[in-house]
From Swiss-Prot:
<comment type="function">
    <text>mRNA-binding protein that binds to the SECIS (selenocysteine insertion sequence) element present in the 3'-UTR of mRNAs encoding selenoproteins and facilitates the incorporation of the rare amino acid selenocysteine. Insertion of selenocysteine at UGA codons is mediated by SECISBP2 and EEFSEC: SECISBP2 (1) specifically binds the SECIS sequence once the 80S ribosome encounters an in-frame UGA codon and (2) contacts the RPS27A/eS31 of the 40S ribosome before ribosome stalling.</text>
</comment>
<dbReference type="GO" id="GO:2000623">
    <property type="term" value="P:negative regulation of nuclear-transcribed mRNA catabolic process, nonsense-mediated decay"/>
</dbReference>
<feature type="region of interest" description="Disordered">
    <location>
        <begin position="774"/>
        <end position="804"/>
    </location>
</feature>
<keyword id="KW-0648">Protein biosynthesis</keyword>
<feature type="short sequence motif" description="Nuclear localization signal">
    <location>
        <begin position="370"/>
        <end position="380"/>
    </location>
</feature>
<dbReference type="GO" id="GO:0035368">
    <property type="term" value="F:selenocysteine insertion sequence binding"/>
</dbReference>
<feature type="region of interest" description="Disordered">
    <location>
        <begin position="448"/>
        <end position="467"/>
    </location>
</feature>
<feature type="compositionally biased region" description="Pro residues">
    <location>
        <begin position="783"/>
        <end position="792"/>
    </location>
</feature>
<dbReference type="InterPro" id="IPR029064">
    <property type="entry name" value="Ribosomal_eL30-like_sf"/>
</dbReference>
<dbReference type="GO" id="GO:0003677">
    <property type="term" value="F:DNA binding"/>
</dbReference>
<dbReference type="GO" id="GO:0005634">
    <property type="term" value="C:nucleus"/>
</dbReference>
<feature type="compositionally biased region" description="Polar residues">
    <location>
        <begin position="321"/>
        <end position="342"/>
    </location>
</feature>
<feature type="modified residue" description="Phosphoserine">
    <location>
        <position position="220"/>
    </location>
</feature>
<feature type="compositionally biased region" description="Polar residues">
    <location>
        <begin position="220"/>
        <end position="232"/>
    </location>
</feature>
<dbReference type="GO" id="GO:1990904">
    <property type="term" value="C:ribonucleoprotein complex"/>
</dbReference>
<dbReference type="GO" id="GO:0006412">
    <property type="term" value="P:translation"/>
</dbReference>
<dbReference type="GO" id="GO:0021756">
    <property type="term" value="P:striatum development"/>
</dbReference>
C-alpha cells in the first residue's frame, strides 16, 4: 500500500538509547493479523496528506489507533479530524512513517483477546474482521464489568513503566512480526515543545464537549462483546492519555477504553472507517473545518455504513486542547491527571466498536465536572496561527442534524469571545493615546467672530471688557505678557497733534465712558456772571420804557451818524486801514476819527450837547487794551506766520512726538500764555482786539492787562491783529482763539521781522492820533485840528444829503463845513512836514 511518508525528525540519528530503557516484548507475538484493505475505500488526493498525516491513499480495513502512541498534544481521534491541528502545530506531533499495511508491531504488557496485532506507526494493531462483526451495542456490558482491581493493577504497571522509561518510543518497521524500539531522542522535540505548552495550558478553558445522549447508536448491543484491553504507552508522554482515560471513563461512555487511552477503529463486513479516510463507500465523505482555538469539527457521513456512523459520532464534540504535557510528568497518576483541565483538552479519543467495559460510570460523573470547569477556565492559545488549507467540504446535514446544530451553536458562542478579546487588546493599546485628528485653526474665522462680537449691538458683556481705540493709536490687549510691549509700541506710534482739537483724542490711561464735566475756572465764572448781568439789564430797560427806548434809539442813530463822518478825517497812517473790509478795520477807522470828534465835539456839542456827548475812541470790536492801529498788512503777515509755525509743529509731531512735545512752537489760551510768559519762555504774543469786555476784578480785562504788562517788562513784542475767529482759523482751529504765544519762530524769521516792523508803525500812528485828540480836548483853534482829506468829500455829500433829507437844521451843516476846512488845513500841514522829514532821511541815507 502506497502512502506518503512525512519527514523524519532531525535529531533521530544523533540521539542514543538510554541504558534504562526496557524493550517492549509483545506477549502474543505469534499471532499476526494482516491489514486487510477495503475495496470500497475512498481514496483522498495526494495533496491531503500534507495537511492530514493520517490520511492514506489505500488505508487498511481494520486499524486501532492509540493516542498514547502520539506525541503529547496530538489529538486522540483519527487524522481526518485533527489534520489541520497537525499542520498548524508541527512541533507538537511526532513524525509518522506511514508504511504498508503488512507492518507488524508487537505490543508488550497488553491484554488482548487476539494473539498479535499489526500496527502502523502511531497505531495499535486491529482485530480481525470476524472479531469486529458484532454490533457496537454489545460493548455495553463489557464496559460495566471492569473492576476496580484491574484498574489499580493497570495503574501500578503504568507507573512502574514511567519510572523506568519516562517515555518509551517505539516505531513499527515494515518487517512482519518484528518489533523495533526507537530511542528516546525520537520524541525529544515533541516532549520539549510539550514542556513549554504545559504552563499556559493549565488555565485554558475547554472549547466544546459532547454527551452520550448525542450518539444513541453507540448504545447498541454491537459493542457489548468487545473485550477490555490495557496497553502500556508505546511512545510519547503518558499524561494526556491517562487524563483522557479517567475523564471519559468516569462519564460511562462505551466508546473506548480510556484507562489505556487507546483509540480503536474497526472495519465491518459492510464497510469500515480506516485510520485516515472514510472507507465504507465512495459516498462516505467527511468535511473538516479545524482552527486552533475551539473552532468546530464538522463531519458528515452517508448512511451506508452504520458502523462508521457510530464510530464518527462518538468523537465529534470532544474537547480540543491547546497545550501538551512535559515528559517529566509521566509518574503522575491517572486520578491527578484527570483533575487537570489542560489534559482534558489535549486529546481526542476516537472510539471504535471494540470499546472498554468499565468506563461508563466514570464518563457520566466526569461530564458534570467538565461543565463546572468550563465556566471557570478560559482557553489560552499558545500556538501561532498559520494559514491552513481547508479540506474538501462535503456535507450531509440530513444524516447528522445534531452535528450541524451543535457546531453552529459553538461557533456562535466562540466568535464573540475572540472578538471581545481582540477589542480588549486594541483598546488597551490605544487607550492612552490621544485623538489623531489634526488640529485646525481658522484665523480668519476667529477674527471675524471677534469683530462680530465687538460690533454686535446687543452682545452680552464678556468677562474681559472690550477696549476700543480712542485715538489714532490702536490699543492692544492688557495681557500680562504683552503689557510692556503694548506700552513700547504705543510710544513708537505717531500720535496726533494735541494742539489740534479736531484730531481724535489719544487714550491716556483710564478713561470714563461719560467724561467728567469740566469745572469752570475763576476767569470763566466771572465772564459768565457779567454776561448774565448784561442780559438782565437789557431786559429791564426794554420792559420799563419802550418809548424811552425808542427815543434812545434815535439818539444812538444820531450818534452813529456823528461818528460816521469822523472816519473821513483820518491822518495819513489811518488811510491804510480804510480799504480793509474786515470788522477790525472798520473799528480802527471809526476809532481814529472818534478821537478827532472827541476834540471838536465840545465845540459842536454846545448847541446840541445830547448828540455830541463824549464820543469814544475804542469800541466793542476795538477794545481799549489795544495800543496800535489795525491794518490789513499786519493781519496778513500774522496769518502767514502762524500757519508756518503750525506746519513746523505738525511735521515735528510726525517725526518724533516725544521731541515735538519738548519743542513746541505755539501755545493757546490766556492761562497758558500767562504761565509760560511768567516762565520767560515766550518770544512773541498775538492778541485778538475784539475780546469780550469784563470789568470785574480778576476778569478778562485784568488778565489781558497783566499779560501786556509782563510782555512790556520782558521787552517781548505783542501784536493786536485779526479777530478771535480769524485767529482760530489761522491756527487750524474751529474755535475762536483770544491769544497765542510763540515759543520759537525759527524757520519763519522773515515773516516775524516784517510783522514786528508793521506793528511798530501801527503803534506810532496810534500815538500820534492820541496826541492830536488831547490837543483838541485842550481847546486848540480849529485850524490846528487835523484836516480831513479831500477823498472824504463824497462821504460828506452823502451825509449832507441824508441830513437834508431828514429835515435837520442847517446849523449842523455849517459846523461840519467848518470842521472840514480845519481838517483839510491840518492835513496839508502834516503832508508838508512828512515830505520834509522824508527828504531829510533820504539825504542822510545818501
Amino acid at each position: 500500500m502506497a502512502s506518503e511518508r512525512p519527514r523524519e525528525p532531525e535529531g533521530e540519528d544523533s540521539i542514543k538509547l538510554s541504558a534504562d530503557v526496557k524493550p517492549f516484548v509483545p506477549k502474543f507475538a505469534g499471532l499476526n493479523v494482516a491489514w486487510s484493505e477495503s475495496s470500497e475505500a475512498c481514496v483522498f488526493p495526494g495533496c491531503a496528506a500534507t495537511y492530514y498525516p493520517f490520511v492514506q491513499e489505500s488505508p487498511a480495513a481494520e486499524q486501532k489507533m492509540y493516542p498514547e502512541d502520539m506525541a503529547f498534544g496530538a489529538p486522540a481521534f483519527p487524522a481526518q479530524y485533527v489534520s489541520s491541528e497537525i499542520a498548524l502545530h508541527p512541533f507538537a506531533y511526532p513524525t509518522y512513517a506511514l508504511e504498508s499495511t503488512q507492518s507488524v508491531c508487537s505490543v508488550p504488557t497488553l491484554q488482548y483477546d487476539y494473539s498479535q496485532a499489526q500496527c502502523h506507526p502511531g497505531f495499535r494493531p486491529a482485530k480481525p474482521r470476524n472479531e469486529h462483526a458484532c454490533p457496537p451495542q454489545e460493548a455495553k456490558c463489557v464496559f460495566k464489568k471492569k473492576s476496580s482491581d484491574e484498574r489499580r493493577a493497570w495503574e501500578e504497571q503504568k507507573s512502574s513503566n514511567r519510572r523506568a522509561d519516562g517515555a518509551v518510543p517505539c516505531e513499527a518497521r515494515p518487517a512482519r512480526g518484528s518489533c523495533h524500539l526507537k530511542s528516546d531522542g525520537y520524541h525529544k522535540r515533541p516532549d520539549r515543545k510539550s514542556r513549554i505548552l504545559t504552563k499556559s495550558a493549565s488555565t485554558s478553558k475547554p472549547e466544546f464537549e459532547f454527551s452520550r445522549l448525542d450518539f444513541p447508536e453507540l448504545q447498541s448491543p454491537k459493542n457489548s462483546n468487545l473485550p477490555e484491553t490495557q496497553k502500556q504507552p508505546r511512545w510519547g508522554p503518558l499524561g494526556p492519555a491517562a487524563s483522557n482515560m479517567s475523564l471519559l471513563g468516569e462519564a460511562g461512555k462505551p466508546v473506548a477504553d480510556m484507562v489505556e487511552g487507546k483509540m480503536v477503529k474497526t472495519d465491518h463486513t459492510d464497510g469500515a472507517v480506516t485510520n485516515n479516510a472514510a472507507t465504507s463507500s465512495p459516498s462516505c465523505t467527511r468535511e473538516l473545518s479545524w482552527t486552533p482555538m475551539g473552532y468546530i469539527v464538522r463531519q458528515t457521513v452517508s448512511s451506508d455504513s452504520a458502523a462508521a456512523t457510530e464510530t464518527v459520532n462518538s468523537i465529534i464534540n470532544l474537547k480540543k486542547t491547546t497545550s501538551s504535557a512535559d515528559a517529566k510528568n509521566v509518574s503522575v497518576t491517572s486520578e491527578a491527571l484527570s483533575s487537570d483541565p489542560s489534559f482534558s483538552r489535549e486529546k481526542r479519543v476516537h472510539p471504535g466498536p471494540k470499546a472498554k467495559a468499565s468506563q461508563g460510570s466514570e464518563l457520566e460523573q466526569n461530564e458534570s465536572s467538565k461543565k463546572n470547569k468550563k465556566k471557570k477556565e478560559k482557553s489560552k492559545s499558545s500556538y501561532e496561527v498559520l494559514p491552513v488549507q481547508e479540506p474538501p467540504r462535503i456535507e450531509d446535514a440530513e444524516e447528522f442534524p445534531n452535528l450541524s446544530v451543535a457546531s453552529e451553536r459553538r461557533h456562535r458562542g466562540e466568535s464573540p469571545k475572540l472578538q471581545s478579546k481582540q477589542q480588549a487588546q486594541n483598546d488597551f493599546k490605544t487607550g492612552g493615546k490621544k485623538s489623531q485628528v489634526p488640529v485646525q485653526l481658522d484665523l480668519g474665522g476667529m477674527l471675524a467672530a471677534l469683530e462680530k462680537q465687538q460690533h454686535a449691538p446687543h452682545a452680552k458683556p464678556s468677562s474681559r471688557p472690550v477696549v476700543f481705540s480712542v485715538g489714532a493709536v490702536p490699543v492692544l490687549s492688557k495681557d500680562a505678557s504683552s503689557g510692556e510691549r503694548g506700552r513700547r509700541s504705543s510710544q513708537v506710534k505717531t500720535p496726533h497733534n494735541p494742539l489740534d482739537s479736531s484730531a481724535p483724542l489719544m487714550k491716556k490711561g483710564k478713561q470714563r465712558e461719560i467724561p467728567k464735566a469740566k469745572k469752570p475756572t475763576s476767569l470763566k465764572k466771572i465772564i459768565l456772571k457779567e454776561r448774565q448781568e448784561r442780559m438782565q439789564q437789557r431786559l429791564q430797560e426794554s420792559a420799563v420804557s419802550p418809548t424811552v427806548a425808542s427815543d434812545d434809539s434815535q439818539d444812538v442813530e444820531s450818534g452813529v451818524t456823528n461818528q460816521i463822518p469822523s472816519p473821513d478825517n483820518p491822518t495819513g497812517p489811518e488811510k491804510t486801514e480804510e480799504p480793509m473790509s474786515s470788522t477790525p478795520v472798520v473799528e480802527g477807522e471809526s476809532e481814529e476819527p472818534a478821537g478827532t470828534e472827541f476834540q471838536r465835539d465840545p465845540e459842536a456839542c454846545q448847541p446840541a450837547p445830547d448828540s455830541a456827548t463824549f464820543p469814544k475812541i475804542h469800541s466793542r470790536r476795538f477794545r481799549d487794551y489795544c495800543s496800535q492801529m489795525l491794518s490789513k498788512e499786519v493781519d496778513a503777515c500774522v496769518t502767514g506766520l502762524l500757519k508756518e509755525l503750525v506746519r513746523f509743529q505738525d511735521r515735528m509731531y510726525q517725526k518724533d512726538p516725544v521731541k515735538a512735545k519738548t519743542k513746541r512752537r505755539l501755545v493757546l489760551g490766556l492761562r497758558e500764555v500767562l504761565k509760560h510768559l511768567k516762565l520767560r519762555k515766550l518770544k512773541c504774543i498775538i492778541i485778538s482786539p475784539n475780546c469780550e469786555k469784563t470789568q470785574s476784578k480778576g476778569g478778562l480785562d485784568d488778565t489781558l492787562h497783566t499779560i501786556i504788562d509782563c510782555a512790556c517788562e520782558q521787552n517781548i513784542p505783542f501784536v493786536f491783529a485779526l479777530n478771535r475767529k480769524a485767529l482760530g482759523r489761522s491756527l487750524n482751529k474751529a474755535v475762536p482763539v483770544s491769544i497765542v504765544g510763540i515759543f520759537s519762530y525759527d524757520g519763519a524769521q522773515d515773516q516775524f521781522h516784517k510783522m514786528v516792523e508793521l506793528t511798530m508803525a501801527a503803534r506810532q500812528a496810534y500815538k500820534t492820533m492820541l496826541e492830536t485828540m488831547r490837543q483838541e480836548q485842550a481847546g486848540e483853534p480849529g485850524p490846528q485840528t487835523p484836516p480831513s482829506p479831500p477823498m472824504q468829500d463824497p462821504i460828506q455829500s452823502t451825509d449832507e444829503g441824508t441830513l437834508a433829507s431828514t429835515g435837520e437844521e442847517p446849523h449842523y451843516i455849517e459846523i461840519w463845513r467848518k470842521h472840514l476846512e480845519a481838517y483839510s488845513q491840518h492835513a496839508l500841514e502834516l503832508e508838508d512836514s512828512l515830505e520834509a522829514s522824508t527828504s531829510q532821511m533820504m539825504n542822510l541815507n545818501l
